[in-house]
Amino acid sequence: MRITGTGHASMRIDTGAGSILCDPWVNPAFFASWFPFPDNSLLDWETLGDVDYLYVSHLHRDHFDAQHLTRFISKKATVLLPAYPTSQLEDELRDLGFKDFLRTKSDEVHELDGGLKIMI
């Protein structure tokens, strides 16, 4: 397993069973008063965004970067959804072109393709 920090709360996790990108954030948020430090805009997002799975923890703009998700993250990625009581996160991601979702349950282990086990 290899974990690559990609700025703020973002990371890419690579395993023999697949790859997961978590909370990718690059563009300024909150009226451009928040921005990633150090600057992560020059990372190879074409490669980093080509993943099997995407995990966005919540809709705060320093975790959910719609512009970046639209431009760089593979729409073939399966989105790992937390067990939230509303569909707002899924709705926002569907609006960006993501189509494949795995709805997780809290405190439950989920086995993904290739045998990768996760718990959200």
Predicted regions and their residues:
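Active-site environment of divalent metal-dependent phosphoester hydrolases
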Residues: 12, 28-29, 59-64, 86-89, ...
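Pre-active-site segment of Zn-dependent metallo-hydrolases
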Residues: 16-55, 59, 66-71
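Beta-strand-turn-beta hairpins that frame and shape the catalytic cleft
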Residues: 1-2, 14-20, 109-119
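Glycine/small-residue-rich loop that forms an oxyanion/phosphate-binding "nest" at active or ligand-binding sites
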Residues: 57-59, 73, 81-83, 102
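Metal-dependent catalytic neighborhoods of phosphoester/phosphodiester hydrolases
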Residues: 65-73, 88-92
